[in-house]
């Protein structure tokens, strides 16, 4: 049976002139969707555009939260697919999506290892520069005291990942989204807790997710993924 695969990304709160351009589609074995609040964003052939309405109490980071909602809840927005490949808008799919979903094997989800941090508490400390400090402290307190999340859980890179549309993956992403809505918008920090609480099966993708400079130019020396940026293993 043919896999039904959706490649999903989102872009909000950015001037279209400054946004990293979407890539031209290389593989026709998936459907491609971008959720955006930009009416005049240039969309290459083959992409399906969906309107995104950022509306959160956290006005400073509402665009981030809106995009994270798409990332985490693709199974609600696009329910008729077997698999979802998420990537931030600076990435592109450089391998046949059918091969990417095969890398899941028996797992519900698969992520790249985080290139720097080795625990969610360490990542949380780094998030202070890009988040409301009080919300950082509240997140740590709730995850540790209320949910007893161990300090040494691994941190995953969430720039790009692949997941199934099944009960375990959907529950994990639902909890992940609930944590994000109530706590920090830094989704790398709350993902380990969602995995721990739901016991979803998670695999590791080879390589690392892509990195970008502040001007949205991709830095080749920081780009080490083997499958999402078109390089070969």
Can you annotate each of these PLM segments?
Residues 1-67, 77-80, 182-186, 197-200, ...:
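N-terminal anchoring/stem segment of glycosyltransferases
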Residues 133-232:
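Catalytic core and acceptor-binding pocket of nucleotide-sugar-dependent glycosyltransferases
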Residues 3, 28, 71, 156-159:
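Residues that flank catalytic or metal-binding motifs in active/ligand-binding sites
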Residues 7, 32, 75, 90, ...:
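A residue-level signal for conserved active-site and pocket-lining positions in enzyme catalytic cores
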Residues 72-125:
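GT-A fold catalytic core of metal-dependent nucleotide-sugar glycosyltransferases
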Residues 8-11, 35-37, 87-89, 95, ...:
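Short His-Asn-centered micro-motif
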Residues 8, 33, 48-50, 85-87, ...:
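Hydrophobic/aromatic beta-strand patches that form the interior of the parallel beta-sheet core
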Residues 108-147, 151-152:
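Acidic, glycine-rich loop-and-strand cores that form catalytic or ligand-binding grooves
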């Amino acid at each position: 049976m043919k896999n039904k695969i959706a490649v999903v990304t989102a872009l909000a709160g950015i001037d279209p002139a400054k946004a990293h351009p979407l890539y031209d589609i290389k593989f026709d074995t998936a459907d491609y969707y971008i959720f955006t609040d930009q009416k005049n964003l240039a969309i290459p052939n083959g992409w399906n555009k969906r309107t995104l309405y950022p509306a959160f109490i956290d006005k400073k980071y509402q665009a981030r939260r809106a995009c994270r909602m798409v990332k985490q809840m693709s199974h609600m927005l696009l329910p008729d697919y077997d698999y979802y490949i998420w990537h931030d808008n600076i990435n592109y799919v450089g391998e046949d999506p059918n091969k990417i979903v095969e890398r899941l094997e028996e797992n519900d989800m698969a992520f790249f290892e985080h290139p720097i941090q080795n625990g969610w508490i360490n990542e949380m400390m780094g998030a202070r520069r890009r988040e409301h400090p009080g919300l950082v402290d509240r997140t740590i307190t709730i995850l540790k005291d209320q949910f007893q999340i161990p300090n040494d859980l691994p941190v995953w890179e969430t720039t790009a990942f692949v997941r199934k549309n099944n009960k375990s993956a959907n529950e994990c992403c639902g909890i992940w989204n609930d944590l994000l809505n109530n706590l920090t918008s830094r989704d790398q920090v709350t993902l380990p807790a969602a995995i721990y609480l739901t016991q979803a099966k998670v695999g590791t993708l080879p390589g690392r997710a892509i990195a970008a400079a502040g001007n949205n130019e991709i830095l080749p020396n920081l780009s080490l993924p083997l499958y999402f940026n078109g390089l070969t293993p």
